[in-house]
Each structure stands twice: as C-alpha cells, then as structure tokens.
Amino acid sequence: MNNLDKQYQELLLDIIQNGSKKSDRTGTGTISVFGRQIRHKMSEGFPLLTTKKMAWKSLVTELLWFLRGDTNIKYLLENNCHIWNGDAYKNYKSQVPDEVKEFSSQSNLNLSMQDFIQRILEDSDFAKKWGDLGPVYGAQWRKWDSKERIVIGHNGMYNEFGTIVIDQISKLINDLKTNPDSRRLMVSAWNVDELDKMVLPPCHYGFQVYTTELTYQERYKIWFSRNYETGMEYNESTTPDFDNSYYDPTPTRKISLMWNQRSVDSFLGLPFNIASYGLLLEIIAREVNMVPDELIGNLGDVHLYSNHLEQAKEQIMRKPFNLPILEISLGEPSIIESPENWSPSDFIVKNYESHNTIKAPLSN
C-alpha cells in the first residue's frame, strides 16, 4: 500500500477543510494550517508521489546543486531546471532602477524573463552578477561563514585575514562515521546573519539524522537481498556469523532523517521537498554504509495558495500507484566529496507509475 500519497492527500484535505485565510508576501493569498507532520518508511518504496507526475530530473539537479555548494542558477539552467528562475529574475528587476529600465534597453538592462535566462546562459559576467541568489542552501550547507577571523597569509609587514568556513555536510558524514549515536547530527541553513543577503530565506531550514543498530536478523536479511543466488531461500531462523568477513560490508546501522520547514507550499513545493530529502537520506546512507529507515517532515505554516485549490481537489480524488524504487549508480567517487562528478542520470527511479501532471502557477 502507498501510504505516502494517502498522507499527502489527507494533508491537502485538512488544509481545505480547516485552513484559515491568510495574506502572504506574494499577494496571492493562502489558506493555512500550522504544525503538521509527514512520516514515511523508506522500506515501503522511494517517496516520489504518484498522484501527479513529478519532475524527477529537476528535483535531482537541485539537490546536486545544493551539495555542490552552488548558489548560481546557471548550473540549474544548463540542466534544464527552472525552479529558481522566478526568484533570480525578481531580484534582477528589483535592483535595476526604473529610470535605467526605461532608457537603457539597448544595453540589455531591461530584459524579459526569457531574455534574462538566455543571457545567464550565454554571458558569464552577467551570470556572475545576476544569476547568484546570495548565500542560500548550498552556501550554508557547504560553506557556512563562521565570521571567525584567522591569518591566511602575509603581505610584507601585514597579515592577511580570512574567515573559517564550515562544511556542514562533510562534518555530518565524519560524525556519522565516528560517533553515530551523537545527538548533534544536524545541518542548518538558517544563518541569521546572512538572511538579508539571500533572495529568499530558507523554507526548509534544517535537518537532523538519527541512527540505531540493526539486529543480526535485519543484517542477514539485508545481506541476503543483496547477495542471494538462484535457488537460495531466505530462512528467518538462521543466525549468521557476522564475525566472518564473508558478510562484510553488510551495514550495521539504519539511519533516519527529519527535516524542519517553516513555510510549506503544499501543492507545488512539498512533493519536491519530500522526494528531495528522501534522496538526501539515500545519499547519506550510501556514504556511511547504513540502511535508510524513516523520513520525517516537521511542517510549520502549511498552506495552499488560493490559485491552487482546484488543482489540490483534483489530486485528492486520484488513486495512488505503488511507489517506485531508487537506484544509484555504483560509481566510486563519493557523492558528498565529488558532487561535480555526478549527474541526474546517475539516479534512477524504477517502476515509477503516476497520474498526469497538474499544472499550477508559481507565486514568487
């Protein structure tokens, strides 16, 4: 049974039936509830909703963009991912003065959205200035600026100073390998000192992982599923000898991930968030040789935009299909250490069956 789509449909219905009308920064208007949760066991399938078709490649591209520590939309555009176009364009329009827009069209300072995107792709100087979104997710995950000054060199009689930059993702992986029972296995994107420098403060602002030991029987079942030969039968009463190297590198622990989200665009954004953190959990588990266990989303302001209500009602009426299975290429490079060596084609969802896409406008 696909319990994930069912939970999601129940959440949409909850918002429609119990939500309060609220204004919002986009001027669109929402109906909203507060404090909800999504829980999914990864053993039941990969958490990619089936009640509407999901843009898998765009989803993977965005997560790889985060893991690269990138904050410029050029990489996204080169991979045909347009999730952040509206935010970048809004930032561009807000910073080009009206008088420049009116009198300087020939210098390409008054561009349409389409021309703006094309210019990002073709002009590296323009992309560097206008394609960057500020210190958003990738910067905080991989390059958190601690503001702690250190000497990085000398220029004659003078010291040259820099600041300590923290790679939270690499630290998380190291901590999982050295202290998997720690209660500090967290990553935050909510850098208060830099919020005003971002085109949009993080909606999903942090996540925590949690690990527990697998039982011998759980380990044997995992080993069997990965190594069985034709004719072998799984026997639950078997007690394997894991001191024997024959069973290595069967995982010894399982890992869960819980993310926190202050603002939840429930129709367009949440399905992406669920699958994206599901993929992140799979990637982290792969890095530390653990088994993905549970995915949990703690959701704050959970809303539907007023121009998404009919689309949500349509999705509620659809019957879910079975969830797909994720396959990650068996490449040697670490996804965390070398995300630039990975592409969306390295992440495949098998047996994905879904209903058609339901289009809805994006509010920026």
Predicted regions and their residues:
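Terminal, non-catalytic protein-protein interaction segments that mediate quaternary/complex assembly
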Residues: 1-364
